[in-house]
Amino acid sequence: DTTTGDPAAAEDFSANLTSRDIEYLDATISGSSAQVRQGEAVLMVGGSSVAFSRCEDIFSRLGSASFHIGGPGSGARMKLVTNVALGLNRAALGEALALAAAMGLDPARALAVMRASVAYSRVMDSKGDKMVSGNFAPDARLSQHLKDVRLILAHGHEAGLAMPFSNTHREVLE
C-alpha cells in the first residue's frame, strides 16, 4: 500500500489481513511523480521483515532506496515525518528567495550560494530554479498536502508536541 495515510489505518489493515493469512506492507513513497517515473523515489516500509524481504525486488524497481522502518504503520509514520521536513524546506526556500529579492540580491545567485552552503537541501534542486523563474506550479494537489499536514498535526498533538512551524504551514496552505 503506497498511500500516504493514517498509520492507525495501516495497522488496522494489517491486523485484518494478517487474520486471513495475508501479508500487508505500508510502503509509502517519498518523491514526486517524475522521481517515481525515473526510479529515484525512496520507499519507507512498515510490516513484517519477512514480507519486506520478499518484496525488495519490487521496491528496487520503484525507487532508488527502500527502508524497512518497523512493524505495521511505521512506513506511514515515517512518511509523515519526511513530509514535515519536505514541506517546511519548501516554505523556507521560498521565503529565503523572496527575502533575497526584496533585499536587492539576485535570487539565482542566492540559490547558488545556498546550494554551496550548509543551508543546502535537495529541495533546492527540485524547486529552486522553478522558484527563481517564477514557476510556482505545485507538483501535487495542495489539498492532498494540506490533508497530510493536518494528519501530521493530529499525530503531533497526540504525542504532546506543539509543532509551531507545521501549524503555520497549515495556515498558509488553508
Per-segment meaning from a language model:
Residues 2, 27, 40-41, 61-65, ...:
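N-terminal glycine-rich phosphate-binding loop for ADP-containing cofactors
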Residues 4-87:
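Rossmann-fold dinucleotide-binding core
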Residues 10, 52, 59, 78-81, ...:
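A general structural signal for well-ordered alpha-helical segments in protein cores
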Residues 24, 109, 164-168:
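Alpha-helix N-cap and coil->helix boundary residues
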Residues 76, 120-174:
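Interdomain hinge/lid region at the active-site interface
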Residues 105-117:
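Small-residue-rich helix-loop
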